[in-house]
Amino acid sequence: MANTPSAKKAVRKIAARTEINKSRRSRVRTFVRKLEDALLSGDKQAAEVAFKAAEPELMRAASKGVMHKNTASRKVSRLAQRVKALKA
């Protein structure tokens, strides 16, 4: 248990940051899920639109420290491959 005032404040800050990160991670998952649905339905136009919406969300999460930048780049790359394969 946090005893010093600074430790108590740190606990509050960590709790607030955790909530923000959960929200950002959930938002990323939602955008990726919409893209997955578009890919599975085979709708090229919807997949393209969903990809253009999901990519900045992934990179924003990386820049905010929610996920590592290499993880975000890998996810973007793999999703782009799938969108490209759908268009071909």
Curated annotation (Swiss-Prot):
Organism the protein comes from: Brucella anthropi (strain ATCC 49188 / DSM 6882 / CCUG 24695 / JCM 21032 / LMG 3331 / NBRC 15819 / NCTC 12168 / Alc 37) (Ochrobactrum anthropi)
InterPro entries per UniProt: Ribosomal_bS20 (IPR002583), Ribosomal_bS20_sf (IPR036510)
Protein name stated in the entry: Small ribosomal subunit protein bS20
GO biological process, one term: translation
Keyword Oxidoreductase listed: no
Keywords attached to this entry: Ribonucleoprotein, Ribosomal protein, RNA-binding, rRNA-binding
Superkingdom, taxonomy of origin: Bacteria
GO CC, any one term: small ribosomal subunit
Signal peptide: none
Family named by the database record: Belongs to the bacterial ribosomal protein bS20 family.
One Gene Ontology MF term: small ribosomal subunit rRNA binding
Function: Binds directly to 16S ribosomal RNA.
Encoding gene per record: rpsT
PANTHER family: 30S RIBOSOMAL PROTEIN S20 (PTHR33398), SMALL RIBOSOMAL SUBUNIT PROTEIN BS20C (PTHR33398:SF1)
